[in-house]
Amino acid sequence: MTTDTTDLELRTSRLLPASPAEVWDVYTDAEKQKVWFSILVEEPGIVRIETDLRVGGQQSAVWGPSEDQLFTEVQTFLEIDAPHRLVTESTGSTPDGQTMTTRIVVTFTAQDGGTLMEVVQSGFPTVEIRDFFVEHAWSGAFDRLAAYLTR
């Protein structure tokens, strides 16, 4: 995994063990997301995801350890070039009501028999939140995607 944290934008990537079409499908299909979202968690808790994968459509995700500790994220699809590029505007909120809106660009490029999945996310309100997404959110997502793809 490589990471560049310029200003309040992050750039991170991981080589995943599947074709771009397979990685795209696992990343964008709501039923598959429900599996990989909690694949490395001993007690998965709650995961609800609905996706309308079209420009202008939205993905709504709700997850957390219990009903009173739920995180939410609504992504609006701005650009879809399957299975190569996905651009969204993401608005997320924490259980205590804090919200944040960012722009996410994800690309899927065939490389070395797998797929280089690259993420550029911008619009973070603080360096600390950006760094959390680098160190935990995207790193964890890549780990879970890899676990799903190799199960």
For the regions a language model picked out, list residue spans one by one:
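Short, hydrophobic/aromatic-enriched beta-strand segments in well-ordered soluble domains
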Residues: 14, 119-121
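Hydrophobic pocket/interface hotspot
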Residues: 23, 27, 33, 59, ...
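A generic structural signal for beta-strand entry/edge sites
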Residues: 7-9, 83-85, 112-116
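Hydrophobic-ligand binding "helix-grip"
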Residues: 34-35, 42, 49-54, 60, ...
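Ser/Thr-centric signal marking residues that sit
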Residues: 28, 102, 115
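Hydrophobic ligand-binding cavity/cleft-lining segments
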Residues: 1-44
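A conserved amphipathic terminal alpha-helix motif
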Residues: 116, 123-151
